[in-house]
């Protein structure tokens, strides 16, 4: 938007008015951790948090030091590859929120050398970013512990793959909600550049209204997405992944 504003002298995506961007659905960034691993971490650290995960990442004694089994090896963190999935960046921002104890995180916070050193220790528990796929929740379902012990992923991805995880592996995946939550709101925005007519803009608005309609918002529940329409609760349908 900034580059177009510089060239055209106006915004092409609006933040207010009839054509402003609006969320279509919402998915929170949550912890997904195998139950056996989560129980060991909670027994040792009392909670699942970025601080706990950092301490687990730097534990030189591996899982025995964390209250787990020696056969588990070292703690393995799972976050999406930031080069393939914006969720990887969201995870790092969420970690920064907890590190600083606030929600207003700026560039200067992320580039702070002390935070960078802490983050490097934390991300050292990721087995291999270069081979990490964009859809790590699906990898949990397919490959189990070889992917990792747990990590922060989109709630919708975890819910969509939960049945596969329960079917293939004896150890269920538990979902935990962090103190500092980041989320994706999947915005629908109307392009208001000079090449779009009023008829085209209004057609886009009509499609937006269709997506926010009760029936479509209820359909989103079967994909583990939270409705943006406040009149549709997460347990509105039998097919909702929030009630399965």
Task: State the predicted function of each range.
Residues 36-43, 84, 97-106, 194-204:
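Short helix-loop capping/hinge motifs at secondary-structure junctions, enriched
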Residues 1-4, 27, 49-53, 87-91, ...:
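Stable alpha-helical elements in mature extracytoplasmic
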Residues 91-176:
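Ligand-binding pocket segment of bilobal, Venus flytrap-like solute-binding proteins
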Residues 189-244:
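Extracellular/periplasmic juxtamembrane helices and adjacent flexible linkers that interface
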Residues 17-31, 116-126, 130-133, 167-196, ...:
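Periplasmic-binding protein-like
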Residues 1-73, 81-84:
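N-terminal segment of the mature folded domain
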Residues 1, 30-33, 75-79, 87, ...:
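Structural recognition of the beta-strand scaffold that forms the well-ordered cores
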Residues 5-9, 33-37, 58, 95-104, ...:
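Sec-exported extracytoplasmic/periplasmic mature domains
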């Amino acid at each position: 938007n900034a580059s177009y504003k510089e060239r055209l002298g106006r915004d092409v995506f609006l933040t207010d008015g009839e054509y402003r961007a609006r969320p279509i659905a919402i998915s929170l960034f949550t912890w997904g951790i195998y139950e056996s691993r989560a129980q060991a971490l909670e027994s040792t650290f009392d909670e699942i948090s970025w601080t706990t995960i950092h301490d687990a990442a730097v534990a030189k004694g591996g899982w025995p030091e964390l209250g787990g089994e020696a056969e588990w090896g070292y703690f393995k963190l799972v976050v999406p590859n930031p080069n393939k999935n914006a969720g990887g960046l969201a995870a790092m921002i969420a970690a920064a929120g907890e590190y600083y104890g606030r929600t207003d995180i700026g560039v200067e916070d992320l580039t702070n050398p002390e935070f960078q050193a802490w983050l490097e220790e934390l991300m050292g528990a990721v087995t291999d970013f270069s081979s990490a796929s964009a859809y790590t929740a699906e990898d949990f379902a397919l490959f189990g512990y070889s992917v990792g012990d747990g990590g922060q992923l989109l709630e919708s991805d975890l819910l969509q793959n939960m049945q596969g995880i329960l079917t293939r592996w004896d150890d269920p995946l538990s979902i935990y909600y962090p103190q500092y939550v980041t989320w994706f709101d999947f915005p629908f925005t109307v392009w208001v550049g000079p090449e779009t007519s009023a008829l085209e803009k209004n057609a886009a608005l009509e499609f937006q209204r269709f997506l926010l309609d009760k029936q479509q918002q209820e359909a989103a529940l079967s994909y583990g997405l939270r409705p943006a329409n406040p009149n549709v609760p997460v347990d509105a349908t039998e097919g909702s992944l929030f009630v399965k």
